[in-house]
Structures are given as C-alpha cells and as structure tokens.
Amino acid sequence: MSQPITRENFDEWMIPVYAPAPFIPVRGEGSRLWDQQGKEYIDFAGGIAVNALGHAHPELREALNEQASKFWHTGNGYTNEPVLRLAKKLIDATFADRVFFCNSGAEANEAALKLARKFAHDRYGSHKSGIVAFKNAFHGRTLFTVSAGGQPAYSQDFAPLPPDIRHAAYNDINSASALIDDATCAVIVEPIQGEGGVVPASNAFLQGLRELCDRHNALLIFDEVQTGVGRTGELYAYMHYGVTPDLLTTAKALGGGFPVGALLTTEECASVMTVGTHGTTYGGNPLASAVAGKVLELINTPEMLNGVKQRHDWFVERLNTINHRYGLFSEVRGLGLLIGCVLNADYAGQAKQISQEAAKAGVMVLIAGGNVVRFAPALNVSEEEVTTGLDRFAAACEHFVSRGSS
C-alpha cells in the first residue's frame, strides 16, 4: 500500500519556490474541484488562466485518449499530423503565416525575443539589439524573459542579467518613445498586464507602439500568453485593438490544461529562423497538439466568444454589488474573463488574505500583486457556478472585513 500524501509532504520534498494552498485538489469537473477531504470549491482561478474549458472536459479527454493510444513522442526529427493540423488552425484564425511550438509561455517568449534579435542582426547588423519592455510586466522565468519582465523582485537575485533591455512605463507612449530608437530590435508588451494587476492597454498606447516600431524598423511582440485563446472575448486580444503585431506568443489556455506554447509570426520574420537556429525536444508533440487542436475548435466559435462577453457582465455586476456592500475595491477592471478587483487604500497589500478567506469559503481566486484580486475562470463557466462562487466570495469578503474591524 502506498504512503498517504499530505500537504506537509510538499514542504519536506519540494524545492520551496512555491507556497501552495493548505489543501490538495484531487478531482475536478467543469468549474468545480474537490480536495482530499471531499470539500468542494468553485474554481475562478482556472489554473492561472489555463483551464479555459474547465476540468476534465469530455471532448479534451477524448482527444487526449485517442492520441495516447497511437503514439506520444518522436522528437523534432519527425513531424506529426496533430501538430500540422494545429498549425493550420492557428494560421487560419490569426494574422500569422508560420508557427513554432514549444511547451510554455516562457519558452514562447524566449523564442520571440531570439527571433527578434536574429531578424535585426541579419537585416541591419549586430548594433540593433535593444529590447524595450514595460515595468510590472511578466514574460516568464527564463533568464531572458524574467529580465524583460520589468519586476526586479523576480530578477534581482540572478545578475548579471542579459544586457540591452530597457523598461518604459506601461500605457505611457511618451515613456516608450523616449526608449525606442534605431538600435531597438523589438518591443514586447502584454495587451493586458496580468501579473502586473490586470491593467488593459489603451488603444492609443498599442497603436502608438505599432507606429514607433514601424518608424524604427523594430518588431512588435504581443505576449498573449494570458490574454489569448478566447480569454478576452476575442480569440486573441490584439483583435480588440485593431493593432497587428509582428510576433504573438500564446500558451496557457491553448492546451486547456495540457502544457503547450506557440510563437506565431509572419513569413518575413520566420524566414530568418533556419534549421538549427532554435528548437525544443517536446514542442509540438502529438499529445499536446491533439488537445490544443480540440481546444481551438471548441473556443473559436461565435457562441463561445460571445458567451465570454456575457459572463464578463455577470461577474462585473455581482462584484460591484459585493463592493457596494463591503467597500473593498476602488475599481473592477479587465476584459472578458480576465478581471481584477483593485483594493482601496484601507486594504492595500491584503489581496492574499482575501484569496485565503475565499478558499476557506469554497471558492478559488487569484491575486495579481498585493493589491488586486484576480478572476480567470473557465470560459464556459455556468451562470449557476458564477452565482454560487460569488456568493461564497461575498461571504469571504464579509468575514475578511469583520475580522479586520473586530
């Protein structure tokens, strides 16, 4: 008989780079999870915007099981049918002509930044290597991507960092303009800063970045790892803005919970990446590709995308009602089903405590820094699940406020 697993085992056996919740989920269905003790949770965290179709979706399970019964892996010396079908679906649905597959958002952003450097070096010379990113951004945990992220708390312990990366203020085109010049090879930006507090870019800001990149022959990279695959009510957030990037990174929801990432780009940009310039062992494996192909098929429909916009209204209306009652938030913001509740000054820095109270009440939420409670539920979350989950969240808010005033 195997040894029972407890939360304490994490503290004994794992490298302590995470501080997970005190309970261990063991089963999920739709937007509900159950822990080892059988307690039910409504999941509004969605695996950090990953589980776009909830837990154990029957059609995703079928796609995975069907491919699992055929073969799992061959390596990049061979291609496979699921990855080619997935590539064609992404190309048909977006601006892209070419796709590179990997396993995560960090890998996709790493590939995008490497491509941008090589494109500039090949076309203009090695002097054109500057990357402009934004403060409070998040692009992954590799040394290159964490340096681009603009959050010193994540990068300061790993110096020396890659050079030629500078950070402008987000949503401030004048700040960006002061840094972007003819030595800039790329600008990387999130259409909505997720980890940075669920801050949507303005239309003028993204349009201004496009114009600056065109003027200085720099590539514009949209990091859509968190905003992509229906999260905002469009398949990709760039479609809201009417601004087309040169490169787009996608991951998280693309696999619906199965690890997969991708870099989308144009024929012109892709042409500099020749055999051997980049690669990954597992990228585009048939298991991930089969699942991601089914995810795209289910999400990229008018019914699903319009449903995201409807669900946004459900959440915002209820969250504003909760806020009217308890006065916790200064703002409820976001697009689609990426929503942030910004704590007012009286509760600054206490988002984590609210998320912990929520879990005790049976609802899972996220934070985005110390001042924002973040919601990133499944795109197909039902109205009943929204109602039940937000009732539990309201109870958590009541307990949090009463505890603070007692």
From Swiss-Prot:
UniProt GO BP: alpha-amino acid biosynthetic process; arginine catabolic process to glutamate; arginine catabolic process to succinate; ornithine catabolic process
Residues with N6-(pyridoxal phosphate)lysine modification: K252
Enzyme class (EC, first level): transferase
Cofactor: pyridoxal 5'-phosphate
Pfam families per record: Aminotran_3 (PF00202)
UniProt pathway: Amino-acid degradation; L-arginine degradation via AST pathway; L-glutamate and succinate from L-arginine: step 3/5
GO MF annotations in UniProt: identical protein binding; pyridoxal phosphate binding; succinylornithine transaminase activity
The enzyme's E.C. designation: 2.6.1.81
Signal peptide: none
Key words, A-Z: Aminotransferase, Arginine metabolism, Pyridoxal phosphate, Transferase
Catalytic activity: N(2)-succinyl-L-ornithine + 2-oxoglutarate = N-succinyl-L-glutamate 5-semialdehyde + L-glutamate
Role played: Catalyzes the transamination of N(2)-succinylornithine and alpha-ketoglutarate into N(2)-succinylglutamate semialdehyde and glutamate. Can also act as an acetylornithine aminotransferase.
The family this protein is said to belong to: Belongs to the class-III pyridoxal-phosphate-dependent aminotransferase family. AstC subfamily.
Entry protein name: Succinylornithine transaminase
